């Protein structure tokens, strides 16, 4: 090959390489521009309906990094379409309950600024669980904590933190309340907050951080609600509220709420004689609640709520191993599904249970007379067979030498089923522990498991002798 041919060959190869590089740069530029403007090609609702843009429910700030030679491309992911929760999955099959969370609020109060609370509960949005409680407007190591045994003051507020985070000074005060309920409909939080005079209280309905509706006392005798989570199905939330005597006939209503607005109110119907402090859970297509009869029965009332036609039915848990405190011993206690058992029915404590086919899972204090200890178990036939007493899978949550308190249910939606969880309020201070002047609580939380589990006891654990007075 002569010198001229070599020059021509080298020039041709160089030109070819230059052309290929030029085309690659054009391809990279086109790819970059295409990915950059891809965010405008998301599928939005056809009727020009605005998409909510709140950080709780919209994931707009996720980036994917793609490397092409030396070019970095950022692609914004389209926002997820937010939908109402419908709770249509089946209930998880469980063998018992496993430990989930404990906040140790009282122990931490010995050396830190922790709120004085009572009436705690837990509820979850689609991505995270939160703990709630009614604060007393003071921390424990504060003279304002004196005499906080009282339930209803204008200083009480609903507190909200991520589950497992004690109520420290930076805790959000959601609303003014001495009785409350909260739930997430899939788009935003609903809070039902009761406060005011005993004879003329107000319930405020706060949705997505805004006050949307309210209702005043209808029987002028301590309007009150669940002290645990409400339930929302396809955008309709239900909450059970009672106004009237705590030891006689009262007026219970079930309110149906859509995005904070009361759309319907149904009176209690069925055979339940007295209903307070219901622990409710989704039982698609409706809602089921296990409540407290503070008048006639130590067996717990059941309230079934039809979300579609607003109809209500009520009865009692069939299990002869009853769930309230005080109660008869297990040999002499009874329940026949339809009526209160008239066994130590006066007084009581908030509690929970849930159906599992014909059986029932339930929790209760170990003591028959006081809020001490806590146990869970399953009663075979306890949902369908009158006075059934065959107990299996018993677990001790708090040993009988330690105090407990209120307890309630909350539901968590998994990939294939809905799990049931519960919390136990661990009360400390007055009236029983008179060395101190305050009354407050911590909580322990368990969730259903299909696996195996061991044994233990999870009391509050604070040494009252080293606590602030």
UniProtKB/Swiss-Prot annotation:
Question: Gene behind this chain?
Answer: NA
Q: Region annotation Head of neuraminidase: residue ranges? A: 91-469
Q: What subcellular compartments does it reside in?
A: Virion membrane; Host apical cell membrane
Stated name of the protein? Neuraminidase
- Residues the record lists as binding Ca(2+): 293, 297, 324
Please tell me where substrate binds in this chain: 118, 152, 276-277, 292, 371
Q: Where is this region: Involved in apical transport and lipid raft association?
A: 11-33
Give the main location.
virion
């Amino acid at each position: 090959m002569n010198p001229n041919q070599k020059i021509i060959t080298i020039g041709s190869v160089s030109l070819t390489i230059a052309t290929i590089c030029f085309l690659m740069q054009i391809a990279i530029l086109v790819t970059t521009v295409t990915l950059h403007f891809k965010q405008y090609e998301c599928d939005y609702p056809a009727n020009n309906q605005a998409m909510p843009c709140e950080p709780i429910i919209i994931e707009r700030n996720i980036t994917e990094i793609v490397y092409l030679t030396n070019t970095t491309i950022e692609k914004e992911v389209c926002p997820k379409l937010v939908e109402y929760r419908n709770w249509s999955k089946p209930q998880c099959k469980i063998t018992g309950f496993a430990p989930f969370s404990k906040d140790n609020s009282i122990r931490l109060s010995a050396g830190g600024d922790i709120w004085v609370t009572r009436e705690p509960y837990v509820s979850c949005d689609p991505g995270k669980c939160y703990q709630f409680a009614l604060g007393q407007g003071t921390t424990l190591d504060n003279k304002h904590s004196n005499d906080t045994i009282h339930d209803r003051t204008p200083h009480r507020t609903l507190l909200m933190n991520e589950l497992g985070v004690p109520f420290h000074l930076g805790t959000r005060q959601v609303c003014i309340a001495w009785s409350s309920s909260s739930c997430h409909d899939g788009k935003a939080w609903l809070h039902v907050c009761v406060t005011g005079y005993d004879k003329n209280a107000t319930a405020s309905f706060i949705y997505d951080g805004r006050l949307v509706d309210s209702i005043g006392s209808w029987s002028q005798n301590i309007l009150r609600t669940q002290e645990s989570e409400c339930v929302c199905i396809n955008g309709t939330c239900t909450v059970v509220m009672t106004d009237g005597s705590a030891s006689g006939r009262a007026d219970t209503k079930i309110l149906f709420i859509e995005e904070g607005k009361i759309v319907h109110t149904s009176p209690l119907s069925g055979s339940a004689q007295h209903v307070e402090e219901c622990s409710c859970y989704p039982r698609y297509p409706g809602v089921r609640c296990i409540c407290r009869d503070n008048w006639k029965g130590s067996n717990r009332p059941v309230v079934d709520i039809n979300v579609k036609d607003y109809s209500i039915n009520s009865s009692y848990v069939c299990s002869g191993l009853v769930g309230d405190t005080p109660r008869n011993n297990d040999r002499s206690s009874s329940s026949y599904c339809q009526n209160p058992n008239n066994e130590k029915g006066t007084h009581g404590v908030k509690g929970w249970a849930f159906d599992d086919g014909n059986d029932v899972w339930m929790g209760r204090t170990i003591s028959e007379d006081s809020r001490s200890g806590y146990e869970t178990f399953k009663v075979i036939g306890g949902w369908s067979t009158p006075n059934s007493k065959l107990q299996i899978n018993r677990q001790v949550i708090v040993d009988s030498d330690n105090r407990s308190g209120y307890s309630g249910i909350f539901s968590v939606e998994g990939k294939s089923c809905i799990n049931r969880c519960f919390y136990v309020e661990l009360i400390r201070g007055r009236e029983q522990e008179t060395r101190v002047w305050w009354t407050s609580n911590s909580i322990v939380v368990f969730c259903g498991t299909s696996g195996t589990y061991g044994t233990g006891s999870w009391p509050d654990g604070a040494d009252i002798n080293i606590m602030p007075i």
